[in-house]
Amino acid sequence: MWIQVRTMDGKVAHTVDSLSRLTKVEELRKKIQELFHVEPGLQRLFYRGKQMEDGHTLFDYDVRLNDTIQLLVRQSLVLPVPVPSSSGGSKERDSELSDTDSGCGLAQSESDKSSNSGEAANEPEGKADEDECDETELGLYKVGEYVDARDTNMGAWFEAKVIRVTRKAPAHDQPSSSSSKPEDDIIYHVTYDDYPENGVVQMTSQNVRARARHTIKWEDLQVGQVVMVNYNPDLPKDRGFWYDAEILRKRETRTARELHANVRIGGDSLNDCRIVFVDEVFKIERPGEGNPMVENPMRRKSGPSCKHCKDDERKLCRMCACHVCGGKQDPDKQLMCDECDMAFHIYCLRPPLSSVPPEEEWYCPDCRIDSSEVVQAGEKLKESKKKAKMASATSSSQRDWGKGMACVGRTKECTIVPSNHFGPIPGIPVGTMWRFRVQVSESGVHRPHVAGIHGRSNHGAYSLVLAGGYEDDVDHGNSFTYTGSGGRDLSGNKRTAEQSCDQKLTNTNRALALNCFAPINDLKGAEAKDWRSGKPVRVVRNVKGRKHSKYAPIEGNRYDGIYKVVRYWPEKGKSGFLVWRFLLRRDDVEPGPWTKEGKDRIKKLGLTMQYPEGYLEALARKEKENSKQAALDKEEEDGEEGFTSPRKGKRKSKSAGGDGSSRGTPKKTKVEPYSLTTQQSSLIKEDKSNMKLWTEILKSLKDGPKFLSKVEETFQCICCQELVFRPITTVCQHNVCKDCLDRSFKAQVFSCPACRYDLGRSYAMTVNQPLQAVLSQLFPGYGSGR
């Protein structure tokens, strides 16, 4: 196993090989020291946002093959010579290495402290500006008068009552200006009629005016007039709050009256908004026009604060009241969650609280994060319940199982088709070869790392590996007899064992039996009359089957095409126990890779053995080290022989280029171009909106199977990172899945996900049918499960 280690700035990177999943972090530090020349004590290693600590293994951090670990080098501080002070003491600096040395610490720097102290010094001046002087008979509106107060965040006007009037004291460093109005220094302390829980709110004179009390009739409304209307910016057809608006136009028909206005929301304006409630247009009261309103006035209608219960006090509501019981009683005993903004009675919590906690922030049980579960920098990992149940956790064996390629885990996953896909994988021709089983899993041909059959007992088998693990297997190439799984004791994390009991037609055995085009029979088995109508099974042959079959590959794993189950039956195997046998026969249009036609096709397609990324480089480094060690050992042996016997004459060494020049440069194999059907070519021509992309893609036809990879890369959805399904080709020439664009519009994002071009709220999503049709033909079955 090998991984990549890279410095945090990305300038230096090295490959660390000869590792195991059970390699300790402290052992990894020693290997990093050899490559980066950094002492283990100065290394900070990060993987997936976690700081790796000694005492854990790579398996604990789930480090996989060819993953990247970041290295941050701590600063090595040198102790200065102590300087004696006038008081006889000495100034000492802490030599201890800390996380702040690397620039990632939480400690406060001196500059931060000085800046904070400056803020603290300026704080009394800010408070001095906000000092208020209580006076009587101030302002236009007196104590007890009903007014309209504007919420500065929403820009809407709410009904309120004046509780107190004060004057703001002038600032010490700001002389009074003769141009300023006396009303500008007045502060009104008001309470909202509908929101008493907000308490007393301070308002400047610009945000307070006389209570609107006169409605304007339809006949008296004029264009350009500024009035107060009810409007809902989020849902324009519903009742909302009260805003100032300038009338643009009005139109009256026999059945309806339309009023359009520019609604003023704070400093912004919503243009050309249709006002629904045309009978509730209020005149804006100017100062001094009417008598002060000190008696309880008529209330205006506003939109309900809760859309679920419509502010009905008799209804239980878990959205605006207690999220547990839905009751609206005891508001003083409710807590608001600072994360989800839901209310909870203190006696509805489990366990209940006796009183309201004094903390400013409070989180409900669903939003609360248990601090004991958080792994902070420098702390050990918490015990994993999942890994504690693994067989490797309870095994007493000292064997290092972490070096096997079956244990490294997948670095990528096949998403072009779902895991329960029957039939061939698009872009994987017959004869494709992989060095390790984990690569076969990554390609999607056979997903399990170790198991021989991939399937579900209620659906069928999707693929199997013929590896010669059972002595009862018989391989004839175009057909073979496969032995079912089970009947072996694999406790203790074993990969294989001798047959120790009878097999049963359950689990994957039953899944493989379901592929046979015949009714299931748990006792005697069954045989299909029309075997070609059965479900297809992808078959992979492994090099281990070479001991039983001449059709197995010489190296690694090879995809041999589609087979169908002809019959299955139980019989006593060579071990003396009952085993289930399955007869499979090849049903694939592509020739078998062991035939002459198949071998020629493999050459034409340019199919070669596929290795994991970095495998050949790691192998070359290992061979280089072994050759160096062998050369050193030989020199030592030659030196010892020199003292005992005379050296023999050296043979003339070959020139470096002598042998290679005779052979010359190997001839490059010509790859068979990928051929499109007539229907596929016509569909590509119909897709005029993507003609530029197709022109570039069609240049890859000469590369054979790589053409499909080019198509998949070009038509990848930027949202889900998958091949586009039901594609929408936008006006800006980008292709997005319809479902992805629907989710974007539901989130009120009406722009192209790729370039942020404004598509508009009313954008018509039309599926590009020619593109969808050609993708479905190139990648059959890729839309299943999407």
Swiss-Prot record:
Residues 82-134, 626-679 are annotated as: Disordered. Residues 220-287 are annotated as: Tudor-like 2. It catalyses: S-ubiquitinyl-[E2 ubiquitin-conjugating enzyme]-L-cysteine + [acceptor protein]-L-lysine = [E2 ubiquitin-conjugating enzyme]-L-cysteine + N(6)-ubiquitinyl-[acceptor protein]-L-lysine. One of its GO terms (molecular function) is ubiquitin protein ligase activity. The record marks C320 as: Histone H3K4me0 binding. Residues 449-450 are annotated as: Required to promote base flipping. Residues 337-341, 357-359 are annotated as: Histone H3R2me0 binding. A zinc finger (RING-type) spans 717-756. Pfam families: PHD, SAD_SRA, TTD, ubiquitin. Multidomain protein that acts as a key epigenetic regulator by bridging DNA methylation and chromatin modification. Specifically recognizes and binds hemimethylated DNA at replication forks via its YDG domain and recruits DNMT1 methyltransferase to ensure faithful propagation of the DNA methylation patterns through DNA replication. This is E3 ubiquitin-protein ligase UHRF1. It comes from Bos taurus.
